[in-house]
A protein has these predicted regions:
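Short beta-strand to alpha-helix junction loop
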Residues: 64, 98-108, 147-167, 295-303
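Active-site substrate-recognition segment that forms the wall
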Residues: 20-25, 81-87, 200-201, 205, ...
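Dinucleotide-binding Rossmann-like beta1-alpha1 core, especially the glycine-rich loop
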Residues: 49-134
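Beta1/beta-strand and adjacent pyrophosphate-binding region of the FAD-binding site
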Residues: 2-15, 31
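Flavin (FAD/FMN) cofactor-binding core of flavoprotein oxidoreductases
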Residues: 129-133, 154, 288, 301-379, ...
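Glycine-rich FAD pyrophosphate-binding loop
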Residues: 24-45
Length: 393
C-alpha cells in the first residue's frame, strides 16, 4: 500500500531530514512528512549558517555526536559535490567574572576546555591580550578567557537539509511536504498510524522530529518538557575594515558578555562578502510562544535594542543599520539538553527534541541513530544521556 511503510518520519528539518536519508540509505521503506516544504524558514533550521564545534561546553555526552556528524557531513559533501561544512575556526570567550547559566553551564568556556582535553581535540587557550592581538574586531574588557578551536566552523543548514532530502528521494525514500501531521496512534496489530490533514499513514516504527510542534503531537503529558522561544537572527553591515571579517580572518564565535541568558552573543564571518554583512545575534528567553501564532515580523525597535545593548559596544566596525532579520524558534528542555526517547506507552514511537538552541551540529549523527533504532541496529553513539527519565530518576 502506498501509505504503508517500514518507518514514518514526522518533521523533516535538521533531525528528520537526516533520519529520512539514513533510512533510505539502509534500504528501508520510509515516508517523511512535513507541514511545510523544507528547507523552510518557519522552524529552527534556517538562517544561512550554524556554528559547529567539537568540544562541547554543554557536556561531554555531546562530543561523540558532533564527531560522528562531522564524518557524515564529509560523506554528504562527497556524494553531492556541495559545500556544507566550512572549518574556519571558532573562538569562545567570556569574562572570568561571569558565572551566569548559559546553555546549562555556569562556566561555559572552562567546560569547553575540559571537553577538548578529555577528547583530545586540538585547541588553544587564550588570554585577553592574545585575543586582542589576533582579533582586534572584538572590543574586550580585559579579563576574558578564550578558547580557540581551529577545526570548528559553520554549517549551511538549508543546504544540509536539501542534500539529505534529495539523496533520500534518490534512494527510494518518500518525502511528503505541505501536509500536517495531526495525530499519532497505536494500532491493535502493532503498527502505528499517523493521521494528517489529508491522509492516514501506517508504519511499524515512527520517528517524531517535529521541532517546536513536537508537544502538540505528543500531547499534554509531554508539553512541559518543551518550551518554545522566539529568537531573532540579524545581519548587520560593516562600516569599515571589511577585509578583517572574511572567513579566512574572522572565526565563528560565542561571546558571553554578562550573566543573563541574553548576554550570550554568537556570530559568523561575512560569508557573502561585505555586502552580505555579519550575522550576529543573541538569545532571549523572555516568554514562551505558540509556533502557530508566533510573530514573524522583526521590528526596528527589537533590532535597535539588540544593537545598542550588545552589538555596538562590542563590535566597533559593525553598523546598526541592519540589512535584514528573521525569526527562529528554539525548543528548550528543562536542562537545556536534548530529549531522545520512546513514548512511555509506545516503544515503537521515538521522539527527538535535539535542539535547545544548539542542535544542528549534532543532527546528522542523531538522524543516523534514529534510523538505526528504527531498524533495530546497534547504535554508533550513546543516546542514553538524553532519555526522558533523567528528570525523575
Amino acid at each position: 500500500m502506498a501509505n504503508t511503510a517500514d518507518v514514518i518520519v514526522v518533521g523533516l528539518g535538521a533531525m528528520g531530514s537526516a533520519a529520512l536519508y539514513q533510512l533510505a540509505k539502509l534500504g528501508s521503506r520510509v515516508i517523511g512528512i512535513d507541514r511545510f516544504n523544507p528547507p523552510h524558514d518557519q522552524g529552527s533550521s534556517h538562517g544561512d549558517t550554524r556554528i559547529t564545534r567539537e568540544a562541547i561546553g554543554e557536556g561531554g555526552e555531546f562530543v561523540p555526536l558532533v564527531l560522528r556528524s562531522n564524518q557524515i557531513w564529509e560523506e554528504l559533501e562527497a556524494a553531492t559535490d556541495r559545500s556544507l561544512h566550512t572549518r574556519n575556526g571558532a573562538l569562545i570567550l567570556a569574562s572570568q567574572s561571569i558565572h551566569g547559566d548559559h546553555h546549562g553551564s555556569t562556566s561555559f568556556v572552562e567546560d569547553t576546555i575540559r571537553a577538548a582535553r578529555e577528547f583530545g581535540i586540538a585547541h588553544e587557550v587564550l588570554d585577553a591580550g592574545e585575543i586582542r592581538r589576533r582579533h582586534p574586531q572584538f572590543t574586550l574588557s580585559g579579563d576574558e578567557l578564550g578558547y580557540f578551536e581551529s577545526g570548528a566552523g559553520f554549517l549551511r543548514p538549508e543546504a544540509c537539509i536539501e542534500a539529505q532530502l534529495n539523496l533520500a528521494r534518490q534512494l527510494g525514500g518518500k518525502a511528503i511536504t505541505s501536509e500536517t501531521a495531526l495525530d499519532i496512534q497505536q494500532e491493535k496489530h502493532g503498527m502505528v498510524e499517523v493521521k494528517t490533514d489529508r491522509e492516514r499513514y501506517s508504519a511499524a516504527r515512527v520517528i517524531v522530529t517535529a521541532g517546536p510542534w513536537i508537544s502538540k503531537l505528543l500531547g499534554a503529558e509531554y508539553a512541559h518538557y518543551f518550551q518554545i522561544y522566539r529568537q531573532v537572527l540579524c545581519w548587520f553591515p560593516l562600516a569599515r575594515n571589511h577585509e578583517q571579517y572574511s572567513p579566512e580572518r574572522f572565526p565563528v564565535f560565542i561571546w558571553i558578555v554578562g550573566d543573563r541568558p541574553c548576554d550570550m552573543l554568537y556570530g559568523f564571518p561575512a560569508i557573502d562578502g561585505p555586502r552580505g554583512g555579519l550575522k550576529i545575534s543573541t538569545e532571549r528567553y523572555d516568554a514562551t510562544v505558540d509556533p502557530d501564532a508566533v510573530p514573524r515580523t522583526v521590528s526596528d525597535s527589537e533590532i535597535a535594542a539588540m544593537y545598542n545593548e550588545h552589538i555596538g559596544p562590542h563590535f566597533p566596525d559593525v553598523s546598526g543599520d541592519y540589512l535584514h532579520a528573521t525569526t527562529c524558534l528554539y525548543t528548550v528542555t528543562p536542562d537545556a539538553k536534548f530529549i531522545v526517547d520512546t513514548l512511555r506507552d509506545g516503544e515503537n514511537v521515538m521522539f527527538a527534541s535535539a535542539c535547545s538552541g544548539h542542535g544542528f551540529k549534532h543532527s546528522a549523527a542523531i538522524g543516523e541513530a534514529l534510523a538505526f533504532w528504527a531498524l533495530e541496529r546497534p547504535l554508533r553513539v550513546d543516546l542514553s544521556p538524553f532519555r526522558l527519565d533523567r528528570f525523575w530518576r
